[in-house]
Amino acid sequence: MTARTDDYDAIVRVVQLYIDGFNDNDVGKFKEAFHEDAWMFYINVDGSLYKNPISKSFENWAAPPSWGVVGRFMSVTQVGDAAAVQLSFDSEKSGGWIDFHNLLRINGVWKITNKSATHCSR
């Protein structure tokens, strides 16, 4: 894990916005966390590959009731203007997931540029 730095704290804050967006039903938090052109690829519980621009998921993710998400940062790695975060993600609505978020510092601001995930048992 990367030593704690201002960048580390900023990276964790951005990914925490993603988690909080689910629990607070807040589209604005997703928009703040993700780059507008970010994509998501994931393998669902049935083994199917899904891919789409991540912004298409914001309204569904923010729909009540709260997802009851518990997120645990498994690793945070940062080199220069790039970072990767591995997140254990468990929710009442969708079960367990392992998320991999790639981030870039763009004009001084950290943004998630893509997400890959796989469904896992609890």
What are these regions (language model features)?
Residues 1-28, 32-36, 48:
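Short, low-complexity N-terminal intrinsically disordered segments enriched in polar/charged residues
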Residues 6-13, 39-96:
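Surface-exposed, charged secondary-structure patches
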Residues 34, 89-91, 116-117:
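Short beta-strand segments enriched in hydrophobic/aromatic residues
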Residues 30-31, 42, 114:
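Hydrophobic residues in well-ordered beta-strands that form the structural core
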Residues 96-122:
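Short beta-strand edge/turn micro-motifs at domain boundaries
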Residues 38-39, 121:
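Short secondary-structure capping/turn micro-motifs that flank functional sites
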